[in-house]
């Protein structure tokens, strides 16, 4: 098969790949971008219809390209984010080929570069940047395999309540996606059961300002990966309905039945761990800690942001928390659908180079792998907390582009 040659190959045409292309162009580095589907494909096909981005409009930006909006503190729907990325692609004008999937990445025979196998040949490159994003492979536990008549869908394939059969719905996973989907289903008149595991709950707004204003001003979003704590939990936040704090006690007061973690299932009966109270308490602790951090920052800098005592108000514990369910009979409860909001994992098995650890995660330092010339971009906590944010990928891309330039021009 024919082999094409380029200096640098970027795999992935989402926001990370486009930003990498922009940084390489700024440094005069010849490159090619490959995208297996369309630009921003996951935004187009793996988000539900009613999703509202949880980042405020003012924070949505890419290098040298601002997000157009009429309300900096508002939140945008998915179509607006897709158009923003499309417009950014037009601004960057990358050398991109869409509809080209890389099936294998391997070292070249001379070990001084790489070969990316594609359907009609291969591409040889001295440098490769893998920018395929952090949300690649939907994670779905195989707990309900003996219940084939039950409608089951991962959050990546969920679209709207009308997609589901009649009846109650069990949402497994109460992160940002699971919580927002559960609220949407409740508003649609569905009876909802929500399995809540370990989570980090933060206020949408506090002392008159959005969460992300505080993260930026305090510098929390710049926390380097070396200072990342042992907890690997993303905060549960929502941009729906103008943005609001996720409060699971409020969920229960509104009619959603909270459950602990699902541990097993047999013959349509689900076993539930006795950990709901602990999970809620841990989420509350993270919430209270953040309020304290903000209070200390305001005090230390003599800032004029009035105290917000309502932020510490707490609803009474609901019956589903004080007397939690330990088993759930799907048929008896009229549950006709299960939505797995259980997150995503990486899918890098096509990289046939010894750079992945036992969990399939790449070994790297701030995106620079231990294999000379092989890089990663757009992953969570690549170099800092905001590395996977739209507003954070540009700094990492610039660092990688500088490193690549050093290799090429040495």
Language model region names:
Residues 2-13, 18-45, 75-410:
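Flavin (primarily FAD) cofactor-binding/catalytic cores of flavoenzymes
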Residues 40-64, 251:
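Redox-cofactor-proximal catalytic regions of oxidoreductases
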Residues 62-66, 378-380:
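A short small-residue
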Residues 68-72:
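A short acidic, helix-capping loop that chelates divalent metal ions and anchors anionic groups
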